[in-house]
Amino acid sequence: MPNPSVPDPELSAAAPTQAAGVVRLFGADVGAHDAAFEGWRLALDGVFDVSRPRDGGDPFRGGIVAHDFGQAVITETHAGNQRFRRDGRTIARGGLDHFLVQLYRQGGFDGEAEGREMAVRPGDVCLFDLSRTMQTDAGQFRNVTLLLPRALLAPLVDTPDDLHGLVLDGSTGPGRILAAHLQSLVAQGALIDPADAGPVMEGTAGLIAGCFRRAMALAGPTDGEAAQVVRHGVRDAVLGAMHRFIDANLTSPELTPDALMQRFHISRP
């Protein structure tokens, strides 16, 4: 059964960038291919390494509007075709200890997440663990992306390592429910009081865990041996980045365990 295409408002024209908690991170609806895409690449640095096909095609168009929920961020994004990638260097550079949940309103991608093949179409919701590697090739798209701390979601599922690369079919009940919730967060993001943002995100994490539970059971675990090799490579990249940072700041009084934890987004055991 084909997935439904989820209606999407025009982002660049209607985004209330002056409202509290709403920030326009990037906008390039017209312009030279190289200059526009370079701005886009810088806006995503630390989250994804991005590249465009060699032939370039039409001038690059894209936009990101972010809604700040304190410990989480949700964005509305539209852009042209490109490749998204996270390898050990990207992971070490960004230091993100988060999950990324994406609803594709229009367009989609084909890709892989540490050996798990992915195919996302309009209406689908996918999930990435940002401590792990992935690569996707997307056509022109519009999506909603939620950046959620690991500490909110991981305790709610039995095997959080199995979340990476899961796709929730947009034609299913759980897929439709989660898609509607993500769209509601975008629509009401500017109106949510900061004092309510934490409980809202806790409830959102619970909904994500519930909606993906059956998808986890059907998909089964990822290739344990291959995933372990990749995770060891990522760990080594992060440790290398930490060693370089320590060497460069040995004489600084601000070089403390807490400073390292904050910079590299790690927690005490």
Question: Where is each model-derived feature located?
Answer:
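Alpha-helical bundle regulatory/interaction domains
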Residues: 2-60, 65, 108-268
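A short glycine-rich, His/Asp/Glu-containing loop-to-beta-strand
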Residues: 40-44, 61-84
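Glycine- and acidic-residue-biased ligand/ion/polar-headgroup-sensing regions
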Residues: 70-72, 78-84, 89-111
